[in-house]
Amino acid sequence: MLEKILIGVAGVLVLFVAVVATRPSAYHVERKLEVAAPADLVFGVLNDLHQFAGVLVLFGSPWEKLDPNMQKTFEGPAAGVGQSYAWSGKEVGKGKMTIEESVPGQKVGMKLEFVEPMESTATCALTLAGTPTGSFVTWSMDGNHNFIGKAFGMFVNMDKMLGTDIEKGLALLKTVAEGR
């Protein structure tokens, strides 16, 4: 009897591993929002991580609320390509974002490096398009899951989880840009 139970458990584990292994590793999450501010103004906030991080701090970032004692450091130029922002905290883990692409008034591309609690990297693009009343901001995030990430994705909707954070970030950006 015990032997049959162990064989059954082993079979379920093998099936689970096989299903996880066949799941796609790449993910893409994207959200858009119209902002009643010109693209150049919005670009200025995004292209300077001091301002971008400041936006999150001043206007109630969910990450700042989660870990108000996290340590933050900035490196590189005053703005644009090469500027980086690193964070470290008990609740938010450890990571770094670096601007890798900067097209004035159009796009800021960043590399995100998550070190703790789970190591991974992702790319983030904030694309701007002018509209008659301001600008349209598209925030996308792309990355690849390792095996554990793919297993986690079977139980958690990554688009919803990451998308909710992106939506909050866009709402904060809108508040700041429209207030300038």
Predicted features and spans:
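Extracytoplasmic/secreted envelope proteins and their assembly/folding machinery
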Residues: A39, F43-F52, G82, K96, ...
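Structured segments of extracytoplasmic/periplasmic soluble domains
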Residues: V45-V55, A129-T131, V176-R180
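Short, highly charged C-terminal tails/helix-capping segments
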Residues: P62-P68, L170-R180
